Amino acid sequence: MFDNNDNQGQLGLYFHWPFCLSKCPYCDFNTHAYENVDHARWLSAYLRAMEFYAEKTQGRVLDTVFFGGGTPSLMEPDVVAAIVARARELWLCDDGLEVSMEANPTSVENSKLAAFAHAGVNRVS
């Protein structure tokens, strides 16, 4: 998947949160309507994957972290904060690092958006 000799250039990370409050009839993405998500278990899996890929991408500069889905705005802000913090530890980061999150306006309130901003999210779509 990665050429260890190709350690130049920018790098983007994508985190897929496959959960939604309900499955939209038009959606073809890998998503599931599930209320009881084990956030700690998902965080552990994301962090393990990050460790693996960090070894394969040494020397690359991280310029984007993207949370997509599903409905990633259903994630706990602490999970997002832990992922962003670990990404900053594992990779050199571009000064303008974009941390972007898809959000459904019906499933996120201002207080949660503020918590995501505190976690490092600087773009919501």
Can you say where each PLM-predicted feature lies in the sequence?
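Radical SAM/AdoMet-radical enzyme domain recognition
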Residues: 62-63, 76-125
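A short, N-terminal amphipathic alpha-helix
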Residues: 46-58
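Canonical Radical SAM [4Fe-4S] cluster-binding loop centered on the CxxxCxxC motif
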Residues: 7-41, 119
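N-terminal [4Fe-4S]-dependent radical SAM core
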Residues: 1-13, 58-60
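Conserved, mostly hydrophobic/aromatic
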Residues: 20, 46, 67, 101, ...
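Glycine-rich anion/phosphate-binding loops
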Residues: 37, 41-45, 104-111
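N-terminal juxtadomain amphipathic helix
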Residues: 37-39, 57-61
